[in-house]
Regions:
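Short helix/loop capping segments that flank catalytic or ligand/cofactor-binding pockets
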Residues: 56-59, 169-172, 281
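Extended oligomerization regions of viral-like shell subunits
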Residues: 42, 150-252
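Structured loops at beta-to-helix junctions and adjacent beta-edge loops in soluble globular domains
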Residues: 49-51, 163-165, 203, 273-275
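N-terminal "assembly arms/tails" that initiate or stabilize quaternary assembly
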Residues: 1-75, 277, 295
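Extended, compositionally biased alpha-helical segments that mediate assembly or anchoring
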Residues: 246, 250-298
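Short acidic, glycine/tyrosine-flanked loop/strand segments centered on an H-E-D-like triad
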Residues: 71-95
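Alpha-helical scaffold segments that mediate packing/assembly in large oligomeric complexes
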Residues: 89-156, 164-166, 289-298
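A residue-level signal for beta-strand positions that form part of recognition/binding surfaces
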Residues: 45, 159, 239, 267-269, ...
Length: 298
């Protein structure tokens, strides 16, 4: 479905700038690391699907069908995470801003929004996924991921978001083993590759202390990602998140994307505003591997 575009504050001349800058060099790519599928429900509400399945029992030919009710569940999602950026363009009125300058300023604004949106999504995955704490991983990184994959009973994980430290260990131990079609990109960027049916992605945001997002109830969540230990309290760190991309729903609504005259200084402003809803619809399909950092005191 992609991004929902409003029309009140969106200049169509510039709207094509948004998606390349929002998705380029991003860990959030629709259809790859999350799903953006949704449907509109009563009173204009936005709903995402959680599809549950049941096994088929073997029988003999010639038997009758046994009907069962659909187990498809619609889950409401609120577009309650707001990201906005306004960049000043001095000395030029909005009508006189050439396209290249508008492109530069709106692109920068979008990329800054992208970073915050990515961090929120990591917080959503860590907070709403299934936790799995263990010892610090210093060797056999791929084995640790495969161990978590075995715990996902139904459905198949296809994405591994790795902390910088964990991804470095993966590359040291298994860099030569990545699928050849993607191996050139791994060698060039050190950021993404395919191995054992998973897309492995370096998520730099997992090295940050925390992430914030508003959950589907409208509650602001502050999620610890890498909490340093103190002399009296243990710390913790996320090693990786293993999940099925269909279980992370992210819906975007472009609220504002425009060049407008400034009322405060001589010039104009490049403004971008995005409202986003995010939810892990099936927590069992998202495994969050963490380890404890021992306190430094005696």
């Amino acid at each position: 479905m992609g991004i929902k575009y409003g029309n009140l504050n969106v200049d169509e001349k510039y709207s094509k700038i948004l998606e390349p800058n929002l998705y380029f060099d991003s860990i959030l790519v629709p259809g790859v690391t999350y799903t953006d599928k949704y449907q509109t429900g009563p009173a204009g509400g936005i709903y995402v699907h959680k599809l549950d399945t049941t096994a088929v029992t073997v029988g003999t030919p010639g038997r009758d069908f046994t009907d069962e009710a659909s187990s498809d569940t619609l889950i409401p999602i609120l577009l309650n995470n707001n990201y906005m950026k306004s960049k000043k363009i001095y000395g030029v009125q909005a009508a006189a801003v050439d396209f290249d300058l508008a492109n530069e300023q709106l692109s920068t604004a979008t990329q800054e929004i992208k970073e915050s949106r990515q961090q929120s999504a990591l917080g959503c995955l860590v907070n709403e996924g299934t936790k799995s704490n263990g010892d610090a991983i210093t060797a056999n990184a791929v084995d640790a991921v495969l161990d978590e994959a075995a715990k996902i009973k139904k459905g198949k994980a296809n994405v591994v978001l790795c902390s910088p430290d964990f991804y470095a260990l993966v590359l040291k131990e298994n860099g030569k083993d990545f699928t050849p079609a993607k191996n050139d990109e791994v060698a060039a960027t050190g950021a993404i590759g395919d191995l054992y049916g998973f897309t492995w992605i370096r998520a730099a945001g997992l090295g940050e202390a925390e992430a914030k997002y508003y959950d589907s109830t409208g509650t602001l969540k502050t999620v610890a990602l890498h909490k340093a230990a103190t002399t009296s309290v243990d710390g913790s760190a996320v090693d990786f998140i293993l999940y099925n991309s269909e279980t992370l729903s992210i819906i975007d609504n472009l609220e504002s994307f425009r060049i407008v005259d400034s009322e405060n200084f001589t010039g104009s402003k490049a403004q971008a505003e995005l409202n986003t809803g995010m939810k892990v619809t099936t927590p069992a399909l998202a495994r969050v591997r963490t380890h404890t950092i021992a306190k430094t005191g005696a």
